Amino acid sequence: MKLITNGRLITRDASAQGYYEHGAVAFEGTKIVEVGEEAALRAKYPGAEIIDARGGVIMPAFINAHTHIYSALARGLSIVGNNPTNFYEVLDGTWWAIDRHLMMDGTRASAAALYIDSIKQGVTTIFDHHASYGEIPGTLHTIAEESKRLGLRSCLCYEVSDRDGEEKCLQAIQENADFITECEKNKDPMLAAMFGGHALFTISDKTFDRMVAANNGRTGYHIHVSEGMNDVYDSLQNYGRRPVQRLQDHGILGPKTILGHCIHVNAAEMEIIKETGTMVVNNPESNMGNAIGICPVLQLHKRGILLGMGTDAYTNDMLESLK
């Protein structure tokens, strides 16, 4: 038994006491046994190992519902000649340029950096959307090794896209399928898989069909949706459907699927998201940084749509994004 003591405890339990000025948490292994006043728990568990919170706040940890390990080491990076004037140029000139050159050692180092900083920021669970088109096979397994080594919960996927050609696209699809199988086999409670897709403007109908076939209903999808207006324009011009409608056509939506951003969704799309029980993740700091708009979180919330928050790897500090 262990006791976390010497801290102000926020339980977020509306049915009981939500705050203790001098609180403590008793836990054993991975299970929280009891929370309450420090003096009472010290008396109840006299032999417990004490973990001193040093006057800090003891509270439930954060879940980062959308981030990108591949960009963990890019903070402060300047690419010569890259002066983007719109969102597509940000992607093409910065992030795609980085992930095309990311090899396995870079992926491992990026994972370690993001996980360590996440721990420091009170994040214990991440939903990562990875891309390393320099070296694809085995990358999710490598990230999972770092996740287990550092003790975080992770739900991982690989970003499928047509942008670097069919061979790379097929490798990305296979990487998702292989990692889903690995998670099914190992049944590790700290590790899970989703099927990743970049965004609708870089995924053809043929590729969506291949993704659905490879997944075979085993898990949900994690995909960027209407992050920029280019995603909406491309979908309407090339497929005659808005992005959420197109996802519905391919059977991508559902209670196990995460839609990142959803900035430029209309009322009809919101209703589809609600009806299918799909989750939306807001990434406010990233949205402001890329000057692409604001996710209509209040409208989504009023419709009863499940919402989460992510950092999009702009930071690992969830409180900073919450501001």
Locations of regions flagged by a protein language model:
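Metal-coordinating catalytic core of metallo-dependent amide/deamination hydrolases
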Residues: 130-263
